């Protein structure tokens, strides 16, 4: 009898416990008899999902690495009128040195268009006219504050719009935009108040309504640093005069469309800020300074993801139990020796920038952590509760070696 046939499954599995994953695979491939035992062997090291997904025993791999790369669109920066735009370029960047009008400049093959901050400062006037931007462009990034955009200049094909200009009025933003981000230093307003007075049966009726410049199609809205709190909406006082007596009624109306589900605010946050947040918002980023204590009853009930500027803000806001994901934006070196607790109902934490937060914040039930790759340049601590780790950066084997054994899923995500 062949010695291979004498080894039962239990013996083979026991032997596998003393081998690395690579050695296990090499051993199983020695002969067909051993290979038939592959469904009984567990693999404990990290393996790329792309390499194991087609294996019939892929479920036996406990720790998996996912790599999410950014779509590479060929780009070209236009700085001079004599520059030749490549035929295969899809992303055109109007550089800071370009000083001409955009008329007859942008080829029809361009799907992504970026206009840099300095463009328009030396053009008098700095205007974008209709039909200058092709109706094939879907991603438009207007960084310049010096540009006046005429009605119809932004084509209906645009779905993702970064609006850095200070000048905005009705019907400038097309109705197909789903992602709208205003520039960090853009000072434009997003709506206006309209007052109408009329006589009804010898009664003077004053009606106030608002007109938002943001289309109903927008689902994700990002308001910049320099935009006033008045951008959120209006408190309207309507007055009716009956039998010589004036009756006032107050109505709160928001400039933010009802269909917005993701909202980012960089303004100072007060209790009345929440009066203008639509009920459909599920992801709310409060990246401005919180000026008052915020009770959980004030926060809209549908919010499941909450973003804060820094983890010190945990002292200023009581997070509702329905919120399961918490995002921190800024890095902060805490001088306060007090240790902060993350609420037990939070299961996912995302850290944009961070010092060694884990020395100052207690993580209770955090299963998912999202963090920048530079965090691993030092030997720093990760909570043992983490099961899924997302790293914003490129795939790095050195990082994998620093991770605790408790992590089962690792995701490298392009910034």
Curated annotation (Swiss-Prot):
Signal peptide: none annotated. It holds the Pfam family FNIP. Disulfide bonds: none annotated. InterPro entries: FNIP (IPR008615), STK_FNIP-Repeat (IPR051251). FNIP repeats lie at residues 148-185. It comes from the Viruses. This is Putative FNIP repeat-containing protein L415.
């Amino acid at each position: 009898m062949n010695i291979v046939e004498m080894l039962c499954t239990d013996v083979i599995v026991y032997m596998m416990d003393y081998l690395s994953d690579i050695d296990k695979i090499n051993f199983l491939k020695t002969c067909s008899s051993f290979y038939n035992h592959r469904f009984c062997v567990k693999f404990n090291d990290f393996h790329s999902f792309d390499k194991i997904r087609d294996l019939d025993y892929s479920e036996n791999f406990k720790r998996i690495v996912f790599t999410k790369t950014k779509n590479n669109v060929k780009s070209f920066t236009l700085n001079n009128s004599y520059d030749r735009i490549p035929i295969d370029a899809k992303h055109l960047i109007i550089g800071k040195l370009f000083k001409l009008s955009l008329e007859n400049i942008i080829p029809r093959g361009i799907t992504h268009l970026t206009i840099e901050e300095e463009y328009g400062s030396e053009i008098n006037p700095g205007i974008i006219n209709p039909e200058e931007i092709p109706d094939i462009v879907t991603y438009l990034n207007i960084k310049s504050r010096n540009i006046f955009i005429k009605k119809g200049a932004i084509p209906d094909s645009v779905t993702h719009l970064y609006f850095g200009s200070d000048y905005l009025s009705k019907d400038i933003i097309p109705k197909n935009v789903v992602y709208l981000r205003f520039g960090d230093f853009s000072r434009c307003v997003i709506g206006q108040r309209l007052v109408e007075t009329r006589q009804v049966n010898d009664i003077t009726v004053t009606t106030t309504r608002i007109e938002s410049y943001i289309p109903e199609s927008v689902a994700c809205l990002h308001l910049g640093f320099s935009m006033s709190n008045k951008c959120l909406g209006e408190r309207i006082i309507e007055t009716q005069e009956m039998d010589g007596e004036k009756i006032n009624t107050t109505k709160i109306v928001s400039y933010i469309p009802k269909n917005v589900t993701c909202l980012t605010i960089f303004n100072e946050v007060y209790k009345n800020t929440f009066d203008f947040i639509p009920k459909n918002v599920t992801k709310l980023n409060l990246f401005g300074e919180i000026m008052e204590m915020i009770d959980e009853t004030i926060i809209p009930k549908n919010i499941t993801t909450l973003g804060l500027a820094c983890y010190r803000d945990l002292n200023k806001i009581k997070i509702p139990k329905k919120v399961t994901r918490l995002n921190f934006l800024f890095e902060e070196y805490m001088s306060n020796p007090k240790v902060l607790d993350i609420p037990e109902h939070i299961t996912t934490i995302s850290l944009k920038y961070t010092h060694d937060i884990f020395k100052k914040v207690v993580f209770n039930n955090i299963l998912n952590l999202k963090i920048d790759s530079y965090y691993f340049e030092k030997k720093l601590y990760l909570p043992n509760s983490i099961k899924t780790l997302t790293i914003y950066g490129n795939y790095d084997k050195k990082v994998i070696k620093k991770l605790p054994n408790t992590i089962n899923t690792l995701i490298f995500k392009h910034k």
